[in-house]
Amino acid sequence: MKDQVKARFDSKPTVNFSDVSSGAWYYDAVQMCAKAGIVAGYPDGSFKPNQAVTRAEFFKMVAMLYSDTLNTPITGGIFKDINGHWAEKYINLLQKLGIVKGDNGSARPNDNLTRGETAAVMNRILGRVVNNSSFSDAKVAAAMKTWPDCTSSHWAYAEIQEATNSHDYTWDINILTYSDHNGIFKAIIKNLQNPVTERWTYIKK
């Protein structure tokens, strides 16, 4: 969380949504995001916690963690389906950071977000670079938690395994420094175009 986002969180009072009770399992998470300015709810005072989230909505939430970069429009992205979209600058930011990769040149901003897509984005935010070869150790493969509806052939298999198993690992880090030509922001990111592979060494139960 950027310093200015944290400052906003620390200074903002509790946000009361009409449909989020203090006893709800997600109450603390909603409060954290609302106080940090990551989510705002709806004009009628509701949050709609059970409503599906679109890719654009989620990408904006993630981009707000980097809100110091959003005062200047971020253009020149690679996605062909976001020109003029309300979330264009947020998606372009995340694409430049290597967090959003899209699908054949499309960001599909109005599609509902899937759990697999969520896992992939969160892994990239946290710098967790993984693929199916990460689990090549036989003992690791035998010990890790798996899911009956997510087999190794699923595109998000490695991402979901990474997000749902606590484990030890080893890796080498390739770092590249990125600065866009307008000087809008500078970020140090892993070279996701040629990533190193995280090797799992032990599953924590």
Describe the residue ranges of each PLM region.
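Feature responds to low-complexity, polar/acidic, surface-exposed segments characteristic
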Residues: M1-Y27, A40-A56, M64-K89, K96-R115, ...
